[in-house]
From Swiss-Prot:
SMART domains, alphabetized: VWA
UniProt name for this protein: Uncharacterized protein MJ0811
InterPro entries cross-referenced by the UniProt entry: VWF_A, vWFA_dom_sf
Domain named VWFA: residues: 273-439
PROSITE patterns: VWFA (PS50234)
PANTHER family: PROTEIN VIAA
Organism for this UniProt entry: Methanocaldococcus jannaschii (strain ATCC 43067 / DSM 2661 / JAL-1 / JCM 10045 / NBRC 100440) (Methanococcus jannaschii)
Stored CDD domains: VWA_YIEM_type
Signal peptide per UniProt: none
Length: 439
């Protein structure tokens, strides 16, 4: 027996399907062969450790594969593994994701500990004094290192899966497509970081949207008939205490003929679309870029719930990329495309703002738009443009919200902004300021 973890045909099929569709795992297995000649079975057993509901070790294992048992014993005998397994058991994509992340970190730690040669020697000659204990410790520390990130990546992956789904839309990706999507996210470190951040910010955006709904009471302005029990008139409530009238109440409830308040709710009024201008200049590279893209993508969730279109513009010293987005039909490829792009030039505010103006003028549906500018840059805006943009805003009822990331706002941009948001650090809560301003 080469596998150290007991598994059945269903488990084997799940692993083989993940391996077949994950080019990244195939690449990792090929690469790790230089460190651990029995790496392929280690990856397979790691998958079973995350996937199976009950994990048991095989009693009889070929001698040279017993080293994998030491590694996985170290990995699974800790609370971090148990927490991760809650997210991965019986889900082949999540289990495969955790497998990739464990293997990446384990072999990185193995290299740092300079145990590669010892492991190779053990695999070929069966010699390696104290090696099992060292590997157990490395595996244990690896699990501690990745546990939080596994949770963040899976949460982010779920966020990406849920984009483009309207209310009540239960269409699911096939297992093969889910694996390929996870593959795209995992093999690009920057996209992985953006998706991790997106998972948190999407939940924050949803909570902010729901908070506005929850705390808005509306204004009573008439009565009507229906069956909304939250808005019953007092005289209808009294009927519930009378045995005879109670049955009349039920009949009228079924017929939607109860007397209720009619609520004038401002939230029901159609809001304008959102034009996002995201700075892609050289100074945004790194954490600011990741935060900015995650914020931009998380706004799609608010737009979807409020039935608002989005127009996305990436700029540096010019407009480099633009795309009109329907939040209810956005594809995974579009999300990956937005997350992947980066340009790295200088900073110019006039060109993206001019493009935003053109979009609003060209598209009737983009009147009353919120223009959201996210930047860490400094670029002056001339007086001629200031007057032109101010006039434009009044004519088309547009609103400019300028977000300055870890920098001070320029005076000229402040002059034409309806709202200025200063982000002093890249904490998740800072994004809440933006969600409040657009929702």
């Amino acid at each position: 027996m080469k596998n150290i973890i007991k598994h059945d045909a269903y488990d084997k099929k799940a692993y083989e399907r993940f391996l077949k569709n994950s080019k990244y795992l195939q690449k990792l297995i090929s690469y790790y062969s230089q460190y651990h000649p029995i790496h392929e079975k280690l990856a397979e057993d790691t998958f079973y450790a995350f996937f199976k509901y009950v994990v048991e070790f095989n009693e009889y294992v070929e001698e040279k594969f017993k080293i994998n048992k030491a590694i996985l014993e170290g990995a699974i005998k800790n609370i971090e593994y148990e927490k991760s397994k809650l997210l991965t058991e019986l889900d082949e994509v999540n289990a495969g994701t955790a497998t990739i992340m464990f293997c990446e970190k384990f072999f990185e730690n193995l290299k740092l500990a300079k145990l590669n040669k010892e492991l190779k020697k053990f695999a070929s000659e069966g010699k390696g004094e104290g090696l099992e204990d060292k590997l157990k410790e490395i595996a244990k520390n690896t699990m501690k290192d990745i546990a939080e990130e596994v949770s963040e990546v899976i949460q982010g992956f779920n966020a990406v899966e849920n984009f483009g789904k309207g209310e009540g839309d239960k269409k699911l990706l096939s297992p093969e497509d889910r694996i390929k999507l996870a593959d795209k996210i995992l093999q690009n470190k920057k996209i992985r970081e953006i998706v991790k951040k997106l998972g948190k910010l999407r939940l924050l955006a949803i909570n902010e949207y729901k908070s506005k709904i929850k705390h808005y009471s509306g204004e009573i302005y008439s009565t009507k008939i229906g069956r909304d029990l939250k808005h019953l008139l007092p005289k209808e409530i009294v009927n519930l205490s009378d045995e005879i009238l109670y049955y009349d109440f039920l009949r009228r409830f079924v017929d939607k003929k109860l007397l209720i308040y009619d609520i004038q709710n401002k939230l029901e009024k159609q809001k304008g679309p959102i034009i996002i201008l995201l700075d892609h200049s050289g100074s945004m590279y790194g954490d600011r870029e990741i935060w900015g893209k995650a914020v931009a993508l998380s706004i799609i969730e608010i737009a979807k719930r409020e039935n608002r279109d989005i127009y996305y513009i990436a700029f540096d010293d010019g407009v480099r990329f633009e795309k009109k987005i329907n939040p209810k039909t956005i594809t995974f490829d579009e999300i990956i495309e937005i997350a992947s792009l980066y340009f790295g030039g200088g900073t110019n505010f006039i060109m993206p703002l001019n493009r935003a103006m053109s979009i609003i003028k060209e598209h009737e549906t983009f009147k009353n738009a919120d223009i959201l500018l996210i930047t860490d840059g400094y670029a002056e805006v001339n007086d001629v443009f200031l007057k032109e943009f101010d006039k434009f805003k009044n004519e088309y009822n547009a609103k400019l919200i300028s977000v300055f990331v870890e920098t001070f706002p320029t005076e000229t941009l402040k002059a034409i902004s309806d709202e200025v948001i200063k982000v002093y650090d890249l904490a998740d809560e800072e994004a809440r300021k933006i969600y409040k301003s657009i929702s």
